[in-house]
């Protein structure tokens, strides 16, 4: 998303809380819990600019910084905020669960900015009627991971939620171990999920579903308002955006790991970062979530899961649109995903033109990476240097016999391009990240933050915001992962 010059301060935010004007059982009004000794760890310049805020307004000793700290700790709300927890349902690992909703987070308010609306959602805000058996708290470990994930995905150009700030507190939270508490102020144009529509469909509340469709269109997709069938038009929009989103996940080696329908954004954003991972060694079957024993949400399953989730959403919309028309829209998913994936992978290979056989060239490159156990991200960086160096780095990264034959085909393909080698290298390095949110690096940041040192968090966040540009002295963040990095297990506990 574009970052623009800003001058607003925190107290100048204005809220228009449209969700609170929907039927009362769409939500429950809840006041955030107050946590002991809340301390700000970092404030995101990208998050500030999304809201139209001047990052300088949060400088040390600035009044807005203390106000933000109090907001993160549940000690205050901003004028115009109306905290609430949203109700929704969804399919979790393929099974419908009617008892879902915001269980640890609150929609604090919907800020109106020059670029549209932004939800301010406080994660770790305490228990709600939808907490089920949860304590409503968030831990520092998962909050750091979500904070960095938004920065990393935005830096890569992948649609995502963001965060304005990350804070910790003196609460001790029981998970697999006792962990420090935290709060995260998440930002998104909307938190509407596929599961919101599933809830209304399963409850046979067709009039309320029409209100929800109208709400999403009016708030976020006004160009669809004049459509003959607004629900069908909205579904087509969601299909296209979801296809592009998952294509980007596949191109950049990202595994969401918990693609339940309640974690799917109606706006095509990456939502709810849990046991996600950016792959190290290229492994199409990567499953970073140790609770996903059957690999339902493995890396190579994500495109198919996206289609399945969209089919559930389409079924939910059948009271408002012709089923055949919705099915026709659903058939647009795979071509849209393939087209976007091909575009992204051509760019990663330095190809501007479209030539028959490019898809096979890409697939054969990935086969080499899998055979070699090559690092997915470093291999692309090394390939970018191949045409301007002796290729030694590339041979180190992809040490397999078939590399030479593939490079001969690649060289032949490059003859159909107009760019010279140096220009192509620059273009490739502008889309192939040097700094990647690897699991072991996130763990190092977490351990430092738990020990009271937020400097690695701030440093890594700055690199992830622009992951393509090398910076002096930052070599450790770009180094190859150690062998033990592959044994780190992740869980859904947050």
Curated annotation (Swiss-Prot):
ATP binds at residues 101, 103-104, 123, 135-136, 186, 193, 272. Keywords: ATP-binding, Magnesium, Manganese, Metal-binding, Nucleotide-binding, Nucleotidyltransferase, Transferase. Its cofactor is Mg(2+); Mn(2+). One of its GO terms (molecular function) is ATP binding. Its EC number is 2.7.7.-, 2.7.7.108. It holds the Pfam family SelO. Mg(2+) binds at residues 263, 272. The active site is at residue 262. InterPro entries: SelO. It is an enzyme of class 2 (transferase). It catalyses: L-seryl-[protein] + ATP = 3-O-(5'-adenylyl)-L-seryl-[protein] + diphosphate; L-threonyl-[protein] + ATP = 3-O-(5'-adenylyl)-L-threonyl-[protein] + diphosphate; L-tyrosyl-[protein] + ATP = O-(5'-adenylyl)-L-tyrosyl-[protein] + diphosphate; L-histidyl-[protein] + UTP = N(tele)-(5'-uridylyl)-L-histidyl-[protein] + diphosphate. Belongs to the SELO family. NCBIfam families: PRK00029.1. Nucleotidyltransferase involved in the post-translational modification of proteins. It can catalyze the addition of adenosine monophosphate (AMP) or uridine monophosphate (UMP) to a protein, resulting in modifications known as AMPylation and UMPylation. This is Protein nucleotidyltransferase YdiU. It comes from Chromohalobacter salexigens (strain ATCC BAA-138 / DSM 3043 / CIP 106854 / NCIMB 13768 / 1H11).
